[in-house]
Design a protein with these regions (language model features):
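Catalytic cores of DNA base-excision repair glycosylases
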Residues: 2-212
Length: 212
């Protein structure tokens, strides 16, 4: 099977069988998505969703968050992984949104990455979901699934991202990000992947190699 055939088969399956795939984070605005995505680093979406209602109630706008103390923000996100650094980054992010972007979440990945605490993955998530930018955010699930399926042999998230963007049509990239995340979260799990329940085994390089 050629690489193109594998991509065509995997994307074709998802397109035909999973026409709707969305983020499991809860948010109502680009600002809320940015905050939630920053909190989700090395933390589950479920835990983030339990935390953000109180945070968004206390700080409903970038202006409110920019004026907050790190200690007050920390008190609301203690159940999140790395709460101290995330509290510092959230306040710094909001302050830079005000000073550099008029309080508006920018659409460009490079601009988003100038915000404290915003790396390439977070920037790609926000640019893709909020603005429909043709980018693919590579988190641990996307990285794992892409390598197992044989969509990439990249050894870094950036290398996998470049492989995916080289082969996934631009109009499919925003939803392809969700396809791969959800597949990794519920089927192609890190420990004990559910291969017997996986509809992609016919095209999966890892499954084929383990079956030899």
């Amino acid at each position: 099977m050629t690489l193109k055939q594998r991509y065509d088969a995997v994307l074709g399956y998802f397109r035909d069988n999973v026409p709707v795939a969305e983020s499991e984070l809860h948010f109502d605005s680009p600002y809320q998505l940015l905050v939630a995505t920053m909190l989700s680093a090395q933390c589950t979406d479920k835990r983030v969703n339990l935390t953000t209602p109180a945070l968004f109630s206390a700080y409903p706008t970038p202006e409110a968050l920019a004026a907050a103390s790190e200690e007050d923000v920390l008190a609301l996100i203690r159940s999140i992984s790395y709460p101290n650094s995330k509290a510092r980054h959230l306040v710094g992010m909001a302050q830079k949104l005000l000073s550099d972007f008029g309080g508006q979440v920018p659409s460009e990945v490079d601009a988003l990455m100038t915000l404290p605490g915003v790396g390439r993955k977070t920037a790609n998530v926000v640019a893709s979901i909020t603005w429909g930018e043709p980018v693919i955010a590579v988190d641990t699930h996307v990285f794992r699934v892409s390598r197992r399926l044989g969509l990439s042999r990249g050894t870094t998230p950036r290398a996998v991202e470049l492989d995916l963007e080289r082969h996934v049509p631009a109009d499919l990239r925003p939803i392809a990000h969700h396809w791969l995340i959800l597949h990794g979260r519920y089927v192609c799990t890190a420990q004990r992947p559910h291969c017997n329940d996986c509809p992609l085994t016919a095209w999966c390089r890892d499954f084929a190699e383990r079956g030899k």
